[in-house]
Amino acid sequence: MTSQVPSSIKGHNALVAKRSAVDSTGALRLEPIDGLKVRFTRPVPHEDGHVMEVARQGWEILDDPVVQVYMTTTLPGRHRAWGLHRFSTDRLFVARGLLKLAVYDGRTDSPTFGYVNEFTLSDRSPGLVVVPPNLYHGWKNIGTDEAIVINMPTDAYQYKEPDAWILPWDSQEAQELIPYRF
C-alpha cells in the first residue's frame, strides 16, 4: 500500500491519512496527558440485556475512595465544556448515549502542557476516564439520544464553595486558549 493518494484524485493534496486510535492489540495509541487515566470496559450480554462494570475496588486507576456518585445528562448536540476543578478529580463514565469527551492540559508546569486527549465513549464502547485537578475537560453529545454520564468525584460537591470552574466552550477565551473544537 502506498503512503500517498494518487495526484489523479481530485482533492488529493487536502487529504490527511487516518491514524487508528488503537494498535493491533487494542491498546491505546494516544499519549495520555500527565495524570489522566482511562480504563475501558465492555458490556457483557446476557439473556435479559447486558451488564458492565463502572468501577471496582482494586482497579489501579481508582486511588481514592468513592465519596459521591451522581449522574448528569446531556441532550443531543449539546455541550458540557469546559470545566476545571482545582482540587477534585472527576471519574467519568458514559452509561448511555454517544459522547465526544476531550481533555486539555493547560498546566504550564506539566510535561504534557498543551496536549489534548479525545475519547469517543458510549454504552457500546464504555470507559472510565479519570481527570485529575487543573485539567480542562468537557464533552459534546454526538448521538441522537440523551446521554447519561456518571461521575464519582474524589471530593463531594460543596454547595457553599464549589470546586467548579467553567470556561464556556463557545467563548472567545476558550477559542483562543484551547486548541480543540467539538
What spans do the regions from the language model cover?
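Non-catalytic, conserved peripheral segments adjacent to functional cores
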Residues: 2-124, 142-182
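Short beta-strand His + acidic residue motifs that chelate non-heme Fe in jelly-roll/DSBH
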Residues: 129, 137-142
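Short, exposed beta-strand "edge-strand" segments with a Pro/Gly-rich flavor and a Y/T-containing core
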Residues: 123-131
